[in-house]
Amino acid sequence: MYKRQIKETYKGELYECPVTVENEKDMEKALEDVNKAECNALVVFLGNFGPETPETLIAERFDGPCMYVAAAEGDGDMINGRGDAYCGMLNCSYNLKMRHLKAYIPEYPVGTADDIAKMIADFVPVARAVIGVSNLKIITFGPRPQDFFACNAPIKGLYELGVELSLIHISEPTRLALI
């Protein structure tokens, strides 16, 4: 119910994966489905009592940026009107950190369909930037001695983003001509 409300509320293009992730096999089916639909960024929606471990592994296995958000409890019966999606979001963020996985988590990741639609709109430029940078190819000029930290440290962050780096050593021309 909640996913459909989010899709209806969000103004942009949004593919709704029909697979509900309850275990690792479901996670694999969901990834197969979104890859088949040629999605290059994901919003992983944590409902109440969701299995955070398989949902967290999506970030590990998907080749693109992922954002994690969670359902707000609406009945007001829980403490401060908050239900189990908030707890699941905490478990998810802990799981991501333990596994050294990168994912985007909004400042307030638990919300209603309207809130989450806004979070998705805010995520789109982040996802575009991550996709653009990770597809970037940089050609640097050297030589850069491998043990000279000051030369190599600035590119570590680029490697972590998946940027392809090629180093061209500039030395003597192999064949020089004078005309």
Residue spans for each PLM region:
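Cofactor- and metal-binding active-site motifs of prokaryotic enzymes
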Residues: 20-134, 145-146
